[in-house]
Amino acid sequence: MGKPWLRALQLLLLLGASWARAGAPRCTYTFVLPPQKFTGAVCWSGPASTRATPEAANASELAALRMRVGRHEELLRELQRLAAADGAVAGEVRALRKESRGLSARLGQLRAQLQHEAGPGAGPGADLGAEPAAALALLGERVLNASAEAQRAAARFHQLDVKFRELAQLVTQQSSLIARLERLCPGGAGGQQQVLPPPPLVPVVPVRLVGSTSDTSRMLDPAPEPQRDQTQRQQEPMASPMPAGHPAVPTKPVGPWQDCAEARQAGHEQSGVYELRVGRHVVSVWCEQQLEGGGWTVIQRRQDGSVNFFTTWQHYKAGFGRPDGEYWLGLEPVYQLTSRGDHELLVLLEDWGGRGARAHYDGFSLEPESDHYRLRLGQYHGDAGDSLSWHNDKPFSTVDRDRDSYSGNCALYQRGGWWYHACAHSNLNGVWHHGGHYRSRYQDGVYWAEFRGGAYSLRKAAMLIRPLKL
């Protein structure tokens, strides 16, 4: 039997090899053996990671080669930059040489011209004298200045060209954006365009041969006037029509008054411009003192198209126009007046044939601005037809304050502020079209549907209010 320690060594070597093959944790062992004399072969078994592999060597060499290639690429790029710079310098040198040759040729021409002016005997080598030499130097300086100015102009042209290209690109971008927005507006879900239905139109009402009363005729048109288109304007503001027997000159009796009815009770029986105290302000209004007992405050008048009623909320709130012509008293002043007590409303109408009509409401008031000056009306009486009760309890709407019941903007379609529903049976603040019947995409005239229909623009209209208790 052999030596026991030798067998133990062989067993340990076999166990180490099996553990390495089975993926056991790698360990190192140190064996101290007594000196022996071996006659056979000695074998070694250990983990494969202790021996160098060709793949590791190839990876390190590849990394080194990549580093060298990277350095060479950097050198090549640097050489390319230097070559480009040299090319630019060479181009500038060629341009300077060309410019120098041009200047030399120009100087030669100038010298020849000076020699020609000096006389026929002066040759190329002749002495031109001090004065021609000074002139030549001056011309040379002018040439240099002109060249410098040309270079500056070229630089400015280049800058302007760059700016023009930038602006052209910006315009192109904005045009494409506008086109895209036009395709999307008014946009709905999924970017699909929502097409709003056209505003409802009032059916054309047959002409009603309504006889104009004497009071209405005196109020709206005491004397014939020339018809004017809406594009024509008067040179002088037209005075409001006056009853017969009184000069049509605006007057300002002593005031201010609470309303026109108070001025009437104080003995002022002439119609004209009066000053009323409305809240903390004093406003000028037209008081009609001879129509149905007087005391009427004119809050709206249309007669010649001299005032544009297609305006904003603030203008309708404060008022605009002149009280002795076309004007709108203002939503806030009317609210202040009607908040003092019960009022009645009288609407006077006249067509282009001189026929007049009236609509009377035994109750009229406006709510405050917090409720958008909502309209409150009483019972209707008259011969014009009731085209305003449909607007009862409706807020006032303008092009910039859309309060109507329509999905679109009635004030935009009908070109004026009004107590719109969806949209209107009347609108006395529309466009003053000349001649009655008019052509327009929408019903945007001065109309009262029950009197001449929605496609007929009236010649004159007025709205007057008065306290019920005089």
UniProtKB/Swiss-Prot annotation:
Gene3D superfamilies: Gamma Fibrinogen, chain A, domain 1. InterPro entries: FIB_ANG-like (IPR037579), Fibrinogen-like_C (IPR036056), Fibrinogen_a/b/g_C_1 (IPR014716), Fibrinogen_a/b/g_C_dom (IPR002181), Fibrinogen_CS (IPR020837). Residues 1-20 form the signal peptide. It comes from the Eukaryota. Its main location: secreted. Disulfide bonds join C260-C287, C410-C423. One of its GO terms (molecular function) is signaling receptor binding. Residues 214-249 are annotated as: Disordered. Residues 251-469 form the Fibrinogen C-terminal domain. SUPFAM superfamilies: Fibrinogen C-terminal domain-like. The keyword Acetylation does not apply. It is found in: Secreted. Keywords: Angiogenesis, Coiled coil, Developmental protein, Differentiation, Disulfide bond, Glycoprotein, Secreted, Signal. Glycans are attached at N58, N145. GO terms for biological process: angiogenesis; blood coagulation; cell differentiation. May play a role in the wound healing process. May promote epidermal proliferation, remodeling and regeneration. May promote the chemotactic activity of endothelial cells and induce neovascularization. May counteract high-fat diet-induced obesity and related insulin resistance through increased energy expenditure. This is Angiopoietin-related protein 6. It comes from Homo sapiens (Human).
